């Protein structure tokens, strides 16, 4: 197939719309549903991300995309009981394969932002992964293939309208890419930088120069995730998965704050008070996500006040106080942080430290690199200058 007609472009008034190849065949096949313009932007960006994660780590990878940026990305490490519970997969009666674990991590890291996502899988989608996908509100999935059992499950989702896309894993695009803006054609070489190159971690200006193998792995995950995130962007990673992604901010510190707040929320969801919230039976997953988001934030009264809590809980929960939240966040350690460009000031490091960051990879090159390094040394953070910028637009 050389061309795929679309219902419309970014918005319903933008017609006609299509995706096509100037030479050769499209590398994708639509197995179910009718993907839209933004669906395909998400699909093709997310596929590149998971493909590179698999190449870099050797493990199955998954990503959850919304509006051409990842809400989550992860590799297939096993889930402990706590993570199973906060990702809402503790009730499944089947074994989680490595690919299913990667999907649960990617989809579960920022559940509010992943609502209505497009997901990507590095490996052939198996039945376990398809069964997890079927439970979530999602627009579609892209993968290099599907087992017969998985395809049956996914084709039943959304009454047969769920988008299922198969991509040729051997497809390699041309080295030059083009796009038009306001009738003007832009052309550039594809960003083919390898982010698992060991030389990226050789320039370590901080006093602490120790990166554990797990820290390097997590920093590579952060950098690959940022490569496909709208700039400016910052990514916090722990235990093989992104736990906070700040995308599309004009200010670097706002990226760091946004991603840090998401990382804090991921960690707060593991607080015993949150994990033991007395939800009513059969409450919708989206309502549960929203309640948790409010409960651990500054607007908890919206669900805890009389007349409100009865809608969601069997009994009125005790509040999670600011002091309790701060104390719990302080327990988070071993977090890795990547940035798609240099940190201009040390305030980014101050904010990152509050979310448990101990390892950083960033381009370097700010006129205030000295201040950034001094702030890292203040907290014993190991930081590498990669000398690689990862802007994405």
What are these regions (language model features)?
Residues 52, 228, 265-269, 354, ...:
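Conserved helix-loop functional segments at active or binding sites
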Residues 71-112, 243-342:
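Glycine- and Gly-Pro-enriched alpha-helical subdomains that act as flexible
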Residues 124, 203-214, 343:
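Bateman/CBS regulatory modules and CBS-like beta-alpha motifs in cytosolic regions of diverse proteins
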Residues 56-64, 164-167, 231-238, 268-279, ...:
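Flexible, glycine/charged-enriched surface loops at secondary-structure junctions
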Residues 22-34, 109-115, 188-209, 286-309, ...:
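Gly-rich Lys/Arg/Thr-decorated short loops/hinges at beta-loop-alpha junctions or inter-strand turns
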Residues 69, 125, 238-241, 343, ...:
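Active-site-proximal loop/turn and secondary-structure-junction residues that shape catalytic pockets
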Residues 1-199, 215-233:
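Active-site loops and adjacent core secondary-structure elements that bind or stabilize anionic groups
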Residues 117, 121-122, 135-165, 170-172, ...:
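C-terminal binding/interaction regions
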């Amino acid at each position: 197939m050389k061309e795929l007609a679309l219902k419309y472009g970014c918005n319903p008034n933008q017609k006609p719309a299509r995706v096509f190849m100037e030479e050769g065949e499209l590398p994708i096949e639509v197995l179910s549903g009718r993907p839209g313009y933004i669906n395909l932007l998400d699909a093709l960006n997310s596929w590149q991300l998971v493909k590179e994660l698999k190449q870099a780590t050797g493990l199955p990878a998954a990503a959850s995309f919304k509006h051409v940026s990842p809400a989550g990305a992860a590799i297939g490490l096993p889930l402990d009981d706590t993570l199973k519970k906060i990702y809402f997969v503790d009730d499944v009666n089947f074994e989680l394969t490595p690919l299913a674990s990667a999907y649960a991590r990617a989809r579960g890291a920022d559940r509010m932002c992943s609502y209505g996502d497009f997901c990507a899988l590095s490996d052939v989608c198996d039945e376990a992964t398809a069964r997890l996908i079927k439970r979530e509100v999602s627009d579609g999935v892209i993968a290099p293939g599907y087992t017969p059992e998985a395809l049956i499950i996914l084709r039943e989702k959304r009454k047969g309208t769920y988008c299922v896309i198969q991509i040729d894993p051997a497809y390699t695009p041309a080295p030059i890419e083009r796009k038009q803006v306001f009738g003007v054609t832009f052309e550039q070489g594809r960003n083919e930088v390898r982010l698992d190159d060991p030389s990226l971690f050789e320039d370590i200006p901080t006093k602490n120069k120790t990166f554990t193998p797990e820290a390097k792995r997590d920093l590579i995950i952060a950098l690959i995730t940022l490569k496909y995130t709208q700039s400016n962007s910052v990514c916090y990673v722990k235990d093989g998965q992104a736990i906070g992604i700040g995308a599309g901010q004009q200010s670097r510190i706002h990226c760091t704050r946004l991603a840090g707040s998401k990382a804090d929320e991921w960690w707060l969801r593991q607080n015993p008070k949150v994990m033991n919230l007395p939800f009513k039976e059969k409450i919708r997953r989206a309502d549960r996500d929203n309640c948790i988001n409010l409960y651990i934030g500054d607007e908890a009264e919206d669900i805890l006040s009389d007349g409100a809590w009865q809608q969601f809980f069997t009994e009125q929960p005790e509040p999670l106080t600011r002091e309790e939240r701060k104390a719990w966040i302080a327990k988070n350690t071993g977090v890795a942080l990547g940035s798609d460009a240099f940190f201009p000031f040390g305030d980014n490091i101050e904010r990152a430290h509050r979310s448990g960051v101990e390892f950083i990879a960033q381009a370097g090159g700010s006129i205030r690199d000295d201040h950034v390094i001094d702030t890292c040394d203040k907290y014993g953070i190991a930081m590498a200058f990669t000398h690689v910028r990862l802007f994405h637009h």
